[in-house]
């Protein structure tokens, strides 16, 4: 059985990590390369860099950053945010990203999923899906959770797998930032719809939440602030999960 993965997410703007981090032993907590390296050394299984830079002109900064990260880190890393076309996705992968995460662009142009998958392999395509309940149905939202697409979550999950995605990053808008736990109802809803790995996102606040996500059917769990602010120690988290019967990677810790 494949090991369940713990993923740290870094929001990057103009080549710097935003949302404060307070690792005392890091000289520059705003440097994504240094932070990424630190995370890889303490047992995080994968990294996700979300580029929240608004302007296209700043894209060059992200490309240079990806190259630096690729040189320094020996765990898989995904780059997402603002990838609107095949050219951008392609350049990020060629510069060293292991995977690209697409969201709004995939909804607007589903063939982009297929194009990336056919060129680089399905394993390089993560489709990020932001969803929330509307009148009792899980609906897909885009533009950072602001726009209701009118697409049912169940339909979009099936579609992205058919198009060639390798993984789904499932974020519960209702839970994001609340630290009240992952949306296990949503994970359980999606699990039977697809054979793709599901990354649970949104709501991590304590170690039990990770266990709940895995028991609900998630293959990986992503978190940001609980790691950045050292509210959860990665080694302790993995030992806790192992103790509760979850297969996690402990070697090197």
From Swiss-Prot:
Recorded hits in CDD domains, A to Z, give: HisF (cd04731)
Record's keyword annotation contains Amino-acid biosynthesis: yes
Q: What class of enzyme is it?
A: lyase
Q: EC number(s) for this protein?
A: 4.3.2.10
Keyword Flavoprotein found: no
Query: Which pathway features in its UniProt record?
Result: Amino-acid biosynthesis; L-histidine biosynthesis; L-histidine from 5-phospho-alpha-D-ribose 1-diphosphate: step 5/9
Q: GO biological process annotations for this chain's record? A: L-histidine biosynthetic process
What keywords are assigned to this protein?
Answer: Amino-acid biosynthesis, Cytoplasm, Histidine biosynthesis, Lyase
The UniProt similarity line reads: Belongs to the HisA/HisF family.
Report the protein's function. Answer: IGPS catalyzes the conversion of PRFAR and glutamine to IGP, AICAR and glutamate. The HisF subunit catalyzes the cyclization activity that produces IGP and AICAR from PRFAR using the ammonia provided by the HisH subunit.
Q: What is this protein's record name?
A: Imidazole glycerol phosphate synthase subunit HisF
Specify the taxonomic lineage.
Bacteria, Thermotogati, Thermotogota, Thermotogae, Thermotogales
Per UniProt, what is the name of the gene that codes for the protein in this document?
Answer: hisF
């Amino acid at each position: 059985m494949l090991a369940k993965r713990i993923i740290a997410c870094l929001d990057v703007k103009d080549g710097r990590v935003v949302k404060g981090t307070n690792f005392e032993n890091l000289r520059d907590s705003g440097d994504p390369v240094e932070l990424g390296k630190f995370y890889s050394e303490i047992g995080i299984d994968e990294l996700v860099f979300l580029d929240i830079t608004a302007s296209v002109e700043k894209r060059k900064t992200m490309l240079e950053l990806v190259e630096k990260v690729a040189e320094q880190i020996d765990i898989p890393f995904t780059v997402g945010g603002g990838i609107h076309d095949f050219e951008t996705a392609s350049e990020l992968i060629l510069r060293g990203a292991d995977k690209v995460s697409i969201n709004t662009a995939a909804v607007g142009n589903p063939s982009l999923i297929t194009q990336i998958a056919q060129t680089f392999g399905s394993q390089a395509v993560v489709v990020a899906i932001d969803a929330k309940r509307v009148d009792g149905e899980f609906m897909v939202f885009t533009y950072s959770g602001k726009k209701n697409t009118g697409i049912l979550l169940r339909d979009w999950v099936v579609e992205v797998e058919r198009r060639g995605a390798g993984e789904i990053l499932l974020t519960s808008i209702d839970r994001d930032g609340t630290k009240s736990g992952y949306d296990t109802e949503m994970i359980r809803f999606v699990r039977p719809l697809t054979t793709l790995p599901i990354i649970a996102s949104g709501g991590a606040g304590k170690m039990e939440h990770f266990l709940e996500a895995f028991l609900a059917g998630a293959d990986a769990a992503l978190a940001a602030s609980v790691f950045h602010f050292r509210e959860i120690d990665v080694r302790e988290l993995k030992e806790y999960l192992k103790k509760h019967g979850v297969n996690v990677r402990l070697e090197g810790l």
